[in-house]
UniProtKB/Swiss-Prot annotation:
It comes from Mycoplasma mobile (strain ATCC 43663 / 163K / NCTC 11711) (Mesomycoplasma mobile). Keywords: Ribonucleoprotein, Ribosomal protein, RNA-binding, rRNA-binding. HAMAP family: Ribosomal_uS8_B. This is Small ribosomal subunit protein uS8. One of the primary rRNA binding proteins, it binds directly to 16S rRNA central domain where it helps coordinate assembly of the platform of the 30S subunit.
Amino acid sequence: MSRVITDPIADMLVRIKNATARKHKNVLIPFSNKKSKILEIIKDQGYIFDFAIEGDSVKKNLNVTLKYKNNISVITGVKRISKPGLKVYSSVEDLPMVLNGYGIAIISTSKGVLTDKQARKENVGGEIVAYIW
C-alpha cells in the first residue's frame, strides 16, 4: 500500500533527518527533478557525500549517501519553510542568513534552485524552500 505524500520536499528532508539520527549510511527517496536539484545543492555545500538515481523509468529513487564527521552527522538540522499551503517568498534584499552564514537557505528562483549566497550573487529573490545547518 502506498501513501499519498502532500509535500514531497518535506518528506525528503524528514527522511534525511531521520536517517542521520539513526546513523544510516544511505537513505532512499522517491525521485523528482526538484528533489534532485535540491540534493545537488546540498552535496555542493558539503552536507551529504553523494547521491545517485536508481531504478527504471517508472519507479526511480534517489539513493543519498550521508556524510559524517567523527561519527556525527554533518547535517545538524533541517527546516521546511515554504509549504504547499503557505508559500514563502523573499526579495533579494530580504533573503535570510541561516545561523549567521553557518547554514544555507535553499531558494527556488527564476534562475533555478540556488543557495541564499548564490541568489544574492545573481541578484534574484524567490521561494524559500528550506534551511539546512
